[in-house]
């Protein structure tokens, strides 16, 4: 105790009691010393981190993202002269997310297979997820497959639930658009999804192996919906992705590994 009869922490020397006056009567009131306050802050940070990790786990669970795409991160982005502008585009998109979200500014990444469109789109998705922003990232084939599968379990209510989850996501990444079956049903569902995002002013990132004209023809052909491509171009800035094939580079690397093993 100090000279006022108040408890003192033997560890930090800080007060464990303070003297206050209420209606003319002085009373001793417990308080946290410096080390107790530090311990409280430490436990609070641990709790906040656990809550953050739990929320992130849930966001990833409901992102519909396949496990193999979780490795698509800017930290794993191998920058070269061919793709440095795409890396810059992706990181700037994430850094300016609040403005992007406000302006409903999406991306239409188009180009030949293997040049990194999907990788870039999922890098953006993972970075935003890390920042606790709800994202759904899935291929058009995978999404339509989930809708069809839901009919077997919940009928039309399953489709409503999936469409609702898409509406709730701050960003929708729709990968490989144009690879889905060329049916009226598929085009109607794609239009419904795109139109809903457009109406709610929520951005999309769309990737396709088709040219812009090829995508337009695929979506708005004889049995298509004329407005669907207009909705996409209204929401998404078209970006041509060029460069060497990442898949070919990966294949060559694996080939070298196998050859090296065989030579031992």
Walk through the language-model features, giving the residues of each.
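Short glycine-rich substrate-engagement loop in P-loop NTPases that contacts/grips substrate
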Residues: 86-87, 129-168, 181
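N-terminal pre-Walker A segment at the start of P-loop NTPase domains
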Residues: 75-100
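Walker A/P-loop nucleotide-binding motif
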Residues: 101-121
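Interdomain "pre-motor" coupling segment immediately N-terminal to P-loop NTPase/helicase cores
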Residues: 19-65
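Conserved alpha-helical scaffold flanking the Walker A/P-loop in AAA+ ATPase domains
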Residues: 95-98, 150-172, 188-196
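Loop/turn-to-beta-strand initiation segments
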Residues: 133-134, 168-171, 200-206
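P-loop NTPase Walker A phosphate-binding motif
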Residues: 119-131
């Amino acid at each position: 105790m100090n000279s006022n009869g108040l408890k003192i922490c033997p560890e930090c020397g800080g007060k464990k009691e303070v003297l206050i006056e209420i209606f003319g009567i002085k009373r001793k009131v417990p308080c946290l010393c410096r080390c107790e306050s530090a311990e409280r802050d430490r436990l609070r940070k641990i709790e906040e981190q656990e809550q953050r990790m739990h929320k992130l786990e849930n966001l990833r669970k409901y992102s519909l993202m396949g496990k193999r795409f979780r490795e698509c991160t800017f930290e794993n982005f191998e920058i070269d002269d061919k793709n440095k502008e795409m890396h810059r585009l992706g990181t700037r998109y994430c850094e300016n997310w609040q403005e992007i979200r406000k302006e409903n500014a999406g991306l239409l990444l188009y180009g030949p297979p293997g040049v990194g469109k999907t990788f870039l789109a999922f890098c953006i998705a993972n970075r935003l997820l890390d920042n606790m922003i709800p994202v759904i990232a899935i291929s058009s084939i995978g999404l339509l497959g989930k809708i069809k599968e839901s009919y077997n379990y919940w009928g039309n209510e399953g489709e409503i639930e999936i469409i609702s989850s898409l509406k709730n996501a701050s960003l929708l990444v729709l990968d490989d658009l144009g690879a889905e079956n060329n049916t009226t049903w598929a085009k109607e569902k794609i239009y419904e999804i795109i139109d809903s995002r457009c109406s709610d002013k929520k951005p999309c990132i769309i990737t396709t192996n088709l040219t812009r004209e090829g995508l337009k023809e695929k979506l708005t052909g004889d049995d298509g919906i004329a407005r669907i491509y207009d909705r996409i171009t209204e929401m998404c800035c078209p970006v041509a992705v060029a460069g060497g094939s990442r898949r070919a580079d990966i294949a060559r690397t694996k080939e070298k590994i196998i050859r090296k093993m065989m030579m031992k």
